[in-house]
Amino acid sequence: MTYHPKSDFIAVMMERGFLADCTDYQGLDEALMKGCQPGYIGFDATAKSLHVGSLIQIMMLRWLQKTGHKPITLMGGGTTKVGDPSFRADERPLLTPAQIDDNIAGIRKVFAAYIDYDSGAENAALMLNNEEWLDDLNYLDFLRDIGRHFSVNRMLSFESVKSRLDREQSLSFLEFNYMILQAYDFMELNRRYGCILQMGGSDQWGNIVNGIDLTRRVIDHEVYGLTSPLLTTSDGKKMGKSQDGAVWLNPDMRSPYEFWQFWRNTTDADVGRFLKLYTELPVGECDRLGALAGSEINAAKVILANEVTALCHGAEAAATAEATAREVFEKGGIGDDLPTLTLGAADLPASIVQLIVKTGLAKSGKEAKRLIAEDGARLNDAPLTDAGMMIEAGDLAAPIKLSAGKKRHALVQLG
């Protein structure tokens, strides 16, 4: 990218690695230079919490506000009833209105940690729900006034739809309507709130472009789209998942200690990149920390874990998590003679059952499986529920703790 931005927001997005594409860099840049501008990201309410995979979008909204603009978090109370088919292999299960409302209430909690809604400042954020304008739409009027602006040929060409059809997997008419509804959201946000920017992951490119085209055609306003990369770790894993499931942002679904441990276990090659994306440390410091090697990189991982946890759960929770980890892993707080199993690369992948036996926490594979089935086994203090879990080298970027009951523990590390 050779474009040299004038606005602080685009400069930050480029410098820290948030940008995958933009519909019009110069046009958006010039619009942002004119003063406080609203920009939004939509979040469908498919679960009671967002997970780490959504954190890059939340950080984009945070930077939008920090550079003087107005973030809008749009809750998909309406679109969740349809389901986004983008790059999904199957149709999402439909949720009831009560389930959607419960999910929105859960998701709402995390945003306040990152974005200011209550200061009364010009750039104070808005939280909106698209059911406000979608629930009362008249279907025939919508087809006549909005549907006529969409080409089915073009919609079929979008990669998010094309990939599904190429695999000969069903795409329901309900899901096919999702991109029209999301486009309508952008137009309504522009009409009601002057919103000029929609952001999202690169899988949302087609939906964003549809919204821009619809807004131009119907109300003749210029709006813009900006996408972030779909993030994977250096070993190709999808961001937001760990060996024991999704890394949720709400503390009642993933404890701050487990959240801290997820970041502490970052692969060496990802440290610098994640510091730029998920913290507010200066870029030069992120580069310096990311370039550390050997045992020194572990100090950078602790900084990463502390910074991200402090943003999400507060500085006190981050400090407590670090102290707990140090007590367990460094000071032997659960016994100075904590047994440690050191594995070589040739030993991996290894089954969790095999590791429980090798660490002496169970005498046999049968006993280890029974321990898991009876909720007596834990991995990094989280319940172990899958006896078929495999541990790979990437999972051992930092030592992991296995527990049997409350008093028997062991460490597994990569030698």
Curated annotation (Swiss-Prot):
Source organism superkingdom: Bacteria
- Positions of short motif 'KMSKS' region: 238-242
Q: Per the record's keyword annotation, is Cell membrane included, yes or no?
A: no
One Pfam entry for this protein is tRNA-synt_1b
GO MF term set: ATP binding; RNA binding; tyrosine-tRNA ligase activity
Q: Which reaction is the catalytic activity of this chain?
A: tRNA(Tyr) + L-tyrosine + ATP = L-tyrosyl-tRNA(Tyr) + AMP + diphosphate + H(+)
Q: What class of enzyme is it?
A: ligase
Please indicate the residue ranges that the annotation assigns to the motif 'HIGH' region. 45-54
Looking up Gene3D superfamilies in the UniProt record yields: HUPs, RNA-binding S4 domain, Tyrosyl-Transfer RNA Synthetase
Where is it mainly found?
cytoplasm
Positions with a binding annotation for L-tyrosine: 40, 178, 182
List the InterPro entries hit by this protein, alphabetically: aa-tRNA-synth_Ic, Rossmann-like_a/b/a_fold, S4_RNA-bd_sf, Tyr-tRNA-ligase, Tyr-tRNA-ligase_bac-type, Tyr-tRNA-ligase_bac_1
Q: Which residues bind ATP?
A: 241
- Name its GO BP terms in alphabetical order: tyrosyl-tRNA aminoacylation
- Residue intervals of the S4 RNA-binding domain: 350-414
Keywords, A to Z? Answer: Aminoacyl-tRNA synthetase, ATP-binding, Cytoplasm, Ligase, Nucleotide-binding, Protein biosynthesis, RNA-binding
Q: Which Enzyme Commission number(s) are on file for it?
A: 6.1.1.1
Record bears the keyword tRNA-binding: no
The entry's cellular-component GO terms read:
cytosol
What subcellular compartments does it reside in?
Answer: Cytoplasm
Quote the subunit structure annotation.
Homodimer.
- PANTHER family named among the record's database cross-references: TYROSINE--TRNA LIGASE, MITOCHONDRIAL (PTHR11766:SF0), TYROSYL-TRNA SYNTHETASE (PTHR11766)
Job of this protein: Catalyzes the attachment of tyrosine to tRNA(Tyr) in a two-step reaction: tyrosine is first activated by ATP to form Tyr-AMP and then transferred to the acceptor end of tRNA(Tyr).
Family recorded in the similarity comment: Belongs to the class-I aminoacyl-tRNA synthetase family. TyrS type 1 subfamily.
Task: Please identify the protein, giving its name as recorded.
Answer: Tyrosine--tRNA ligase
Native source organism of the sequence:
Ruegeria pomeroyi (strain ATCC 700808 / DSM 15171 / DSS-3) (Silicibacter pomeroyi)
Which gene underlies this protein?
tyrS
